[in-house]
Amino acid sequence: MLKSSKHEDSSSKKNQNNKLIFIVRQLFYLIKHFFSKTKTPDNFFGIIKRLKINSQKMSLDEFNILANLLKLEDKIVEDIMVPRSDIIAIKLTTNLEELSESIKIAVPHTRTLIYDGTLDNVVGFIHIKDLFKALATKQNSPLKRLIRKHIIAAPSMKLLDLLAKMRRERTHIAIVVDEYGGTDGLVTIEDLIEEIVGRIDDEHDQQLDSANFKVINNSTIIANARIEVELLEEIIGEKLKNDDDEFDTIGGLVLTRVSSVPAIGTRIDISENIEIEVTDATPRSLKQVKIRLKNGLNSDNLT
């Protein structure tokens, strides 16, 4: 009996592995097709057909990866880019010692943009391992020698085209520029991968999630202004956005009630129950707000 059970388990695992290998292989063929200069519709739809036949055997994760990949064809850079206001970058004139400290304190990523003069003149990016290697070997290298190249993308560029360009150019970062050549945002290879496989949380993401939305007590919430309004609606159990509203974030909600970016300390009545106070902002954008609930939170919404 034990031998039979082990044999069945082994056979089941083998079948699951074979199925997963098939799905992954077909997905890679599909991606390769998008990157190919000579795309053939017959090959493309043949792959889709083979995947469709096996779709009933797919796990939910496998199916979602396939669905996300197919959706990617319709998405553009503007849909996923990190906006200019959220970009963290370092001046080209920064020396290696200062750069090391800046990255430790303020930069949570392995790659950091370098700009000359203003953020509209990004000269490339550095990888943290190159920096620490230079420091460890006590190389007195100018920052320029550590800079890796980035690529330029328009907001309207297709994500699949950007993915192909990153692959050709062997780079992980694209700077998104507007019609005047100014920096509009950035996209990383990780952003593109997450569009296919879903969000990949690391320790830093978990720390950010905790910092971005924090329930202080029954009547007070501290939130990043870029948090989606839908999350706030779910927590407080109150509708704040109409179907025809064009904003998505808490910051957008605030800006619909005032004519310009409000100063720190400004309080805005959103409804009879909700008051929002600006706790952090720049002249161009809201950063953080304090949400006061006059009637308090409904505990049922927190479970």
Swiss-Prot record:
Disulfide bonds: none annotated. Transformation of Salmonella with tlyC results in the escape of transformants from endosomal vacuoles into the host cell cytosol. According to PubMed:17301007, the hemolysin protein was detected only in the virulent strain ATCC VR-142 / Breinl and not in the avirulent strain Madrid E, at their current detection limit of 10 fmol. This is Hemolysin C. Signal peptide: none annotated. Residues 81-143, 146-203 form the CBS domain. Keywords: CBS domain, Cytolysis, Hemolysis, Repeat, Toxin, Virulence. InterPro entries: CBS_dom, CBS_dom_sf, FAD-bd_PCMH-like_sf, FAD-bd_PCMH_sub2, Ion_transp-like_CBS, Transptr-assoc_dom, UPF0053_domain. Induction: Expressed at 30 minutes post-infection during the period that most rickettsiae escape from phagosomal vacuoles into the host cytosol. One of its GO terms (molecular function) is toxin activity. Belongs to the UPF0053 family. Hemolysin C subfamily. It comes from the Bacteria. The keyword Repeat applies. GO terms for biological process: killing of cells of another organism. PROSITE patterns: CBS.
